[in-house]
Swiss-Prot record:
Its cofactor is [4Fe-4S] cluster. Keywords: 4Fe-4S, Iron, Iron-sulfur, Metal-binding, Oxidoreductase, PQQ biosynthesis, S-adenosyl-L-methionine. SUPFAM superfamilies: Radical SAM enzymes. It comes from Ruegeria pomeroyi (strain ATCC 700808 / DSM 15171 / DSS-3). Binds 1 [4Fe-4S] cluster. The cluster is coordinated with 3 cysteines and an exchangeable S-adenosyl-L-methionine. This is PqqA peptide cyclase. [4Fe-4S] cluster binds at C27, C31, C34. InterPro entries: 4Fe4S-binding_SPASM_dom, Aldolase_TIM, Elp3/MiaA/NifB-like_rSAM, PQQ_synth_PqqE_bac, PqqE-like, Radical_SAM_PqqE_MftC-like, rSAM. Its EC number is 1.21.98.4. Belongs to the radical SAM superfamily. PqqE family. The gene is pqqE. It holds the Pfam family Radical_SAM. The lineage of its organism: Bacteria, Pseudomonadati, Pseudomonadota, Alphaproteobacteria, Rhodobacterales. It catalyses: [PQQ precursor protein] + S-adenosyl-L-methionine = E-Y cross-linked-[PQQ precursor protein] + 5'-deoxyadenosine + L-methionine + H(+).
């Protein structure tokens, strides 16, 4: 809970263990499920190399162990190698989250040389036609497969991140086979979450309940069969769950995000909560923001939750669910996440499901493309 007594905040709030560094919002793909904010930051507003390096040093001093270099497409940054070196020198385990577009063999060599620990490669589909249609980028699948082969040849640990939805969930078994062929150590079967741009494509993307149940069965069988070969992270669609996820392990509990312009966020979608005020780095230090920032303290703990949550035996398991989803679906970020079957607003999720599934078969993608001016 937020510090309300005389103790220093460092005594009551745990240090973060992970940080997501959104180096840029620029991206060559146009995925209809993009979770980045509706308002994107152009190149001119991005933090420079030295400022990011300072952020990495401060993150390590704060207690962060894992750094995820993300975007947009982080390979859009010409200084990606320098940023990776700075992260490694700060002592952070560094993971690159990428579409693969922009990663040449020479660039992979340079990234490996400066200490990159891990790559997380996105996968839109298992065939060129499907993947290129979903990503809105012709030739993207072929380039991705070439990059994956280069990663495998170098022995860089690889996670494949497959965002699954109505159009590719039936291809899950082939997705698992492809992960093994590419030498991935982990496969994230991440059913699309409806935040940011993805909400515009809910009808086109939401899988059926039958697809979701089949996916659960396929993942469970594959986990047992491939134990020791391929690890799995399965994120089912929120809307079919009985209980919400423990979003971010609890607001302001385990991780923080830095947007391309230096805005420091408790979670990826936090800027959708309009009454919150967010601090920027380097205007304030990461330590100040983590422990004292108003946005980080707004929903820490469970005191803000309604009685439905506070009296529930799951309150310290899921922390009432996602604050951003509570706002989007219930109109109140302090409410019980309507995904929860015990929420008084759960009927709104049922209505969304019915509407999306009724109109989804013929729905077209609205692709995400960044305006050219930065």
């Amino acid at each position: 809970m937020p510090n309300s007594g005389g103790e220093a905040p460092e005594m009551t709030v745990p240090a973060p263990i992970a940080m997501l560094a959104e180096l840029t919002h620029r991206c060559p793909l146009a995925c209809p499920y993009c979770s980045n904010p509706l308002a994107l930051h152009g190149k001119a507003r991005e933090l420079d190399t030295q400022t990011w390096a300072r952020a990495f040093d401060e993150a390590a001093a704060l207690g962060v162990l894992q750094l995820h270099l993300s975007g947009g497409e982080p390979a859009s940054r010409p200084d990606l190698v320098e940023l990776t070196r700075a992260a490694h020198e700060a002592g952070l385990y560094t993971n690159l989250i990428t579409s693969g577009i922009g990663l040449t063999p020479a660039r992979l060599d340079a990234l490996e040389a400066v200490g990159l620990d891990h790559i997380q490669l996105s996968l839109q589909g298992t065939t060129p036609d499907l993947a290129d249609r979903i990503g809105g980028y012709k030739g993207g699948f072929a380039r991705k497969m070439a990059v994956a082969a280069e990663i495998k040849a170098r022995g860089i640990p690889l996670t494949l991140n497959a965002v699954m939805h109505r159009h590719n969930l039936d291809d899950l078994e082939r997705t698992i086979e492809l992960a093994i062929e590419l030498g991935a150590r982990r496969l994230e079967v991440a059913c699309v979450q409806f935040h940011g741009w993805a909400t515009r494509n809910r009808a086109a993307l939401l899988p059926s309940r039958a697809q979701t149940e089949a996916a659960k069965r396929i993942v469970a069988e594959a986990e047992a069969r491939l134990r020791g070969t391929l690890a799995f992270d399965f994120v089912p669609p929120d809307y079919y769950a009985d209980y919400p996820k423990a979003c971010m392990g609890g607001w302001g509990s385990a991780g923080l995000n830095i947007a391309p312009d230096g805005t420091v966020l408790p979670c990826h979608a936090a800027e959708t909560i309009p009454h919150l005020s967010f601090d920027r780095f380097p205007d304030k230090t990461l330590r100040e923001i983590w422990y004292e920032g108003a946005a980080f303290n707004a929903y820490r703990g469970t005191d803000h939750l309604p009685e439905t949550c506070r009296s529930c035996d799951r309150v310290n398991i899921d922390f009432g669910g996602c604050r951003c989803q509570a706002l989007a679906l219930a109109g109140d970020p302090a409410a019980t996440d309507p995904v929860c079957s015990r929420s008084p607003d759960h009927h709104k999720v049922t209505a969304l499901l019915e509407a999306a599934l009724a109109g989804g078969d013929g729905a077209e993608f609205t692709y995400r493309r960044m305006p050219r001016k930065g």
